[in-house]
Amino acid sequence: MTHDLTADRARLAELIRQLAVVHGKVTLSSGKEADYYIDLRRITLHHEAAPLVGRVMLGLLDEAGIEFEAAGGLTMGADPVGTAVMHAAGDRGIDAFVVRKTQKVHGLARQVEGPGVDGRKVVILEDTSTTGGSALTAVEGVRNAGGDIQAVAVIVDRDTGAAEHVAEQAGVPYLYAFSKNDLGLD
């Protein structure tokens, strides 16, 4: 089945505005305060929006010419984004993975769970980013596991320095599907 990426982007933006944007004072995971919160779990776990997330993120990566074999990021925000991309990729053989904040000390003592990333081209995904901290934690974990990071891609960029931090500290392209301005947030 072929999908219209422009229509998918428009519908996903509409769903984000309707379901995920919560106005009011909040403290973000970065410790910064904001006048709104974008709860993208309301999108990435939503029956209609999740497939759109997968197609839009895959389209974003394809348009940028990013080749990869696996996609994932820091648990928990990135978990459903990775599986959405995996499903959208269909028969392309893209795996999903999750990255723990710290390496386990029991079991297999892994920080990266799922199909192995060692020697594979991977993309780090995130739902939203303020400073890039979660993405950078995932980058470090995946690199320690032997993954070859091709890019960091987020659904919504808050335009508060994440792109610069990722470029400077990880040295990989930083892509986003929507800016806060795309969603009418200032």
Language model: regions and residue ranges:
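Short glycine-rich phosphate-binding loop at a beta-alpha junction
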Residues: 66-75, 153-154
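Solvent-exposed alpha-helices and their adjacent loops that cap or buttress functional pockets
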Residues: 30, 90, 114-118, 141-146, ...
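Conserved acidic residues
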Residues: 69, 120, 150
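Short, glycine/charge-rich flexible loops or terminal/linker lids adjacent to PRPP-binding catalytic cores
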Residues: 82-123, 131-136
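Phosphate/pyrophosphate-binding loops at sites that engage ATP/ADP/AMP, CoA/4′-phosphopantetheine
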Residues: 57-68, 139-145
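Active-site-facing substrate-recognition patch
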Residues: 1-64
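PRPP-dependent phosphoribosyltransferase catalytic core
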Residues: 2-15, 140-186
